[in-house]
């Protein structure tokens, strides 16, 4: 194969390689969006933390800072205890992620957006959900799982 034939072959291989990378990136973004959807379906379940157990990586390095957190919660075991206590005063919640922006790099992804909804407390009061949120996901054994969740009030 002469130099004249090598360049077109190289260009063709590069095009197929780039197309494969794009397809993988699209698949990963879709996977992160599915993990996000599962997270927000789990967060509205008022239980002992079982729903969240299905969407979080159960590792010692997961982190959580929620709207009622007084400290950074590190590790799955600490977080599981948190969810059990966190859910006690609620009778129900609705929460949706709006205006989400997703970025994937390798086996990590992050998503930033706004959480919007309403929480009904057991005492009959309601609380508006209107937070800025950052979620971090890790692809573990082919599955995107939450490894960090941080929410804060919107600046006034």
Residue locations for each model-derived region?
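A short, structured loop/turn motif at beta-sheet edges
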Residues: 102-109, 122-125, 137-143
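Short beta-strand edge/turn micro-motifs at domain boundaries
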Residues: 110, 130-155
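Generic short beta-strand segments
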Residues: 113-120
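A solvent-exposed, acidic/Ser-Thr-rich amphipathic alpha-helical stretch
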Residues: 29-31, 49-104, 114, 128-129
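Generic C-terminal helix-cap and adjacent flexible tail
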Residues: 26-27, 154-156
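Bacterial N-terminal signal peptides that target proteins for export
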Residues: 1-9
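Short, low-complexity N-terminal intrinsically disordered segments enriched in polar/charged residues
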Residues: 20-55
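Bacterial N-terminal signal peptides
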Residues: 8-19
